[in-house]
Amino acid sequence: MNWATMDDKPPANRKGPPRSEIHAEQGKPIAPPTTAGEPRGTLLALWVEERGESECPAVMDGIRAETLPDAKAGRLPRGHSWRDNLDKSLYGGKQMTAMDAKAFDAGAPSRAAQMWDRANWSDIEAEVKRLQLRIAKAVREGRWGKVKALQRLLTRSHGGKMLAVKRVTENRGKRTPGVDGRIWSLPAARRKGMLSLRHRGYRAMPLRRVYIPKSNGKKRPLGIPCMRCRAMQALWKLALEPVAETLADANSYGFRPERSTADAIEQCFNVLAKRASPEWILEGDIRGCFDNFSHSWFLENIPMDKEVLRKWLQAGYIDEGTLFESQAGTPQGGVISPVIANMALDGLEAAVDASVGTSTLVRRKAQLNVVRYADDFVVTGVSKDVLESRVLPAVRQFMAARGLELSEEKTRITNIAAGFDFLGQNVRKYDGKLLIKPANKSIKSLLDKVRGIIKDNASATQEALIRQLNPVIRGWAQYHRHVVSKVTFSSIDSHIWRWLWKWAKRRHPMKGARWVRQRYFRRDGYRFWDFATKGSTEGDTCGLQLFRAATVVIQRHVKVRGLANPFDPAWDTYFARRRTAKRSARLPGATPWC
């Protein structure tokens, strides 16, 4: 039945005026007629699709979601409509008025803002998670046609688009614009941005090139997408992440949900701590990893919409007003870049194992283990010869297929007795005992940053200085709290105290040491030299205090299981217990979690 050719006239067996005559004056949306024996939900879908795509994707999603149950029931429940279903799924069961519906379709800013704030995010996240679980299940079953269909369903769903916009407008980069200079800070702008996430006619805008300093003094280039491209990438990340997690290497820990650098360091301890553990380590360094990935490899192997992926990869970037083409690589700064980079490097463990043969006994004797965090990785081996003659050529071949190469200067093979640095930690055996401590480079970087803050705030108030120092010291200490770092923490506190004493003395050259001490240092229990402001009330000796790294409790980290998948329902109980144990460990006086 083609309603588009009937000029909106009802069938002969239907009484009453055409629906086209009952319209905006009543403040209600136009709906197509129904015929006896045909489900209304099915007719709604046919009527809207044949007349062209609705101006509001939410309408289409509500109609399509309603079609399946209607086909079984034969008709809608009395007193219900597709608007009611849309209200219940997105707005927590609140009834949408005629004025709300008109504002939703027309995009009125005030009403759109209210409806964005009224969205039931828990239900939206649950619906997206259900689709992600179905995608992961299809991957495990090898049903790639179903994977593609479910990805298409998720990336075109109203809930998926809303969640994608929510994530890019609430993360740390929400106030960083792209080349168009726009940010979606208001609810009305977010809703409008959500409606713009359409695949038909989508064009990726060039990236805005910015540079951030590296630890070696050089600068790292970042590509900042515009908000619409960012939201589109976040939308596809929702659909691609279940695939990536299901196919990922067991000992890959970078930019993955429920994993961290602490898991990678703990895996190093697990494979190197025993006396019979391998003693040789290959430290791998990929030259310009994110800048040199092969676009052709991505397009051939990443299971997503190829046209959308090609537009992202070839969008180019603008640097100082000049447009540059992108011939290779994926931009650092893109929402989806870590996911596709991880997928490109997955398979490294299998390539390393295959380098010594197919025999399980031979592999076990070679003692090969791979620990990878994004583009940083180490490989253990029983001897230097095995790593040099077997493993290293296999790794080079693996990287070459993806357009990458190892850095000859930074890739080296070392003995565990000499130690190696990995993710800011130094891993080394002392007389047969493995100790993991903060790396000297990491310590120097922290002290240089603290010294710079103190120097730049020579004339600032004590309170302003403390507020700048505390996040830096606390963040560094929290990162290193899982390794042997208690002595290091005390040493750092000592250095910082001496610099602050000089800072205080320099501000008052005509005052004595006793006066300076009483002005800037307070007593806290048995401590007489805490750098702190004066208390605001009587009896309160200390106000705002400088955070001391030595107060951080050392806690042994429990590594996540290698095969644990957050998109597999079989692991839900495991992750729930793990999150509960982590929260409990943060409470005062809590014991290390396990």
Model-flagged regions — what are they?
Residues 1-191:
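Non-catalytic, polymerase-adjacent accessory regions of viral genome-replication enzymes
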Residues 2, 7, 22, 66, ...:
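Right-hand nucleic-acid polymerase module
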Residues 186-204:
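Amphipathic alpha-helical blocks
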Residues 196, 200, 247-251, 255-259, ...:
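Conserved polymerase palm-domain catalytic core
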Residues 203-215, 310-325, 467-470:
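Active-site-adjacent bridging/hinge elements
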Residues 402-476:
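A conserved non-catalytic segment of reverse transcriptases
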Residues 493-499, 504-593:
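Extended C-terminal regions of large enzymes
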